[in-house]
Amino acid sequence: MSKAKFERTKPHVNIGTIGHVDHGKTSLTAAITKVLGFQGKANYTSYENIDKAPEERERGITISTSHVEYETDNRHYAHVDCPGHADYVKNMITGAAQMDGAILVVSAADGPMPQTREHILLARQVGVPYIVVFLNKCDMVDDEELLELVEMEIRELLNTYEFPGDEIPIIRGSALAALESTATSVDAPEYQPILKLMEEVDKYIPTPQRDIDKPFAMPVEDVFTITGRGTVATGRVERGTLKMGDEVEIVGLSDSPKKTVVTGIEMFRKLLDQAVAGDNIGALLRGIQRNEVERGQVLAKPGSIKPHTYFEAQVYVLTKEEGGRHTPFFNNYRPQFYFRTTDVTGVVELPQGTEMVMPGDHITMKVKLITPVAMEEGLKFAIREGGRTVGAGNVSKIIE
């Protein structure tokens, strides 16, 4: 098959497969590329190629993830699949690949298992907004009643973690049957569940709002003064657009944001009328002294982000092999929390009944920072000690 050129005109959606080990996540990923490949909408990627995922380093953490891309009539998809359970936990917490939706794979022969539960919980905590279920290995179960029982169990589990379990589409099929089939026509019966799944993903997972359409935010990386013109803050626009004359707030590292107006935008030494998500810019700030803005603050559309000091987070603690701590930590542990462009010291509160946290653990904890940081739910951070990363986290709930 000739390499189909992916048209970038279609809306783009990031998805991934989640679920218990050996329930068929990687087989399903391969089957999707095979079946869509018949329609010229994907390049078939074999199970072996997905399974030997390359290791990537994200914020100093090694994660194995496989990325495949494919398209349907309506959309372009980037799809992540992780070989190991620890890779999923790390991937979902660090947001190496932020998912707009996930395909939960459950083996019909086994029903929901411990990691099924953990992945649903993680999806809830780190803000994966939509789940579609693929009930795999249905060819191994002859009993229709058993299939219905497993479906009920899955729906109950989803409801437990505040997903709309009763509305979520569940598609029955067999990824292996699709992979092993020698049929070259996309109309073969064993390929229908895969096509049905993609149809449901298209329908059920909404197209995400693009970064450029969100309210403006730019983490400040550096600040300098231009004699006669004023103070310039530089950084990469995280989201939204900024036009000359826009009012912005300087948020974080102080209790209340400071308002100012952007009187000039510069990129590569040229003046711009406007900057968009992804641009590296310098913003000239009216009436702001050199000491009133610093690295670690965020320029943002007024009212869109607030400074906070106390939050709950999902945290993955690095193992010794990953360069993390060699010993556990306890309540009142005081590391640095690295948000966007700066470190702030914080105090850790462990959940009741948790004596200590070991390297390699995934834990929910509360953190009290000594200085406010521009923060919203879903924000990623690293935990550092003396400049080295010892953990990664995701703000799951702001307390104050």
From Swiss-Prot:
GO MF, one term, reads: GTP binding
Q: What is its main location?
A: cytoplasm
Q: Where in the cell is it found?
A: Cytoplasm
Renumbered residue ranges of the record's region G5:
174-176
* EC number from the UniProt entry: 3.6.5.3
| A GO CC annotation given for this chain | cytosol
Question: Region (G2): which ranges?
Answer: 60-64
Q: Which reaction does it catalyse?
A: GTP + H2O = GDP + phosphate + H(+)
Chain segments carrying region G1: 19-26
Signal peptide annotation: none
Asked if the Swiss-Prot or TrEMBL record annotates the protein with the keyword Iron, the reply is no
* Amino-acid positions noted as binding Mg(2+) in the UniProt annotation, renumbered to this chain: 26
The entry's keywords = Cytoplasm, Elongation factor, GTP-binding, Hydrolase, Magnesium, Metal-binding, Nucleotide-binding, Protein biosynthesis
Q: Which NCBIfam families does the entry link to?
A: EF-Tu (TIGR00485), PRK00049.1 (NF000766), PRK12735.1 (NF009372), PRK12736.1 (NF009373), small_GTP (TIGR00231)
Q: What family is it from?
A: Belongs to the TRAFAC class translation factor GTPase superfamily. Classic translation factor GTPase family. EF-Tu/EF-1A subfamily.
Q: What function is annotated for this protein?
A: GTP hydrolase that promotes the GTP-dependent binding of aminoacyl-tRNA to the A-site of ribosomes during protein biosynthesis.
What subunit structure does UniProt give? Monomer.
This chain belongs to the protein called Elongation factor Tu
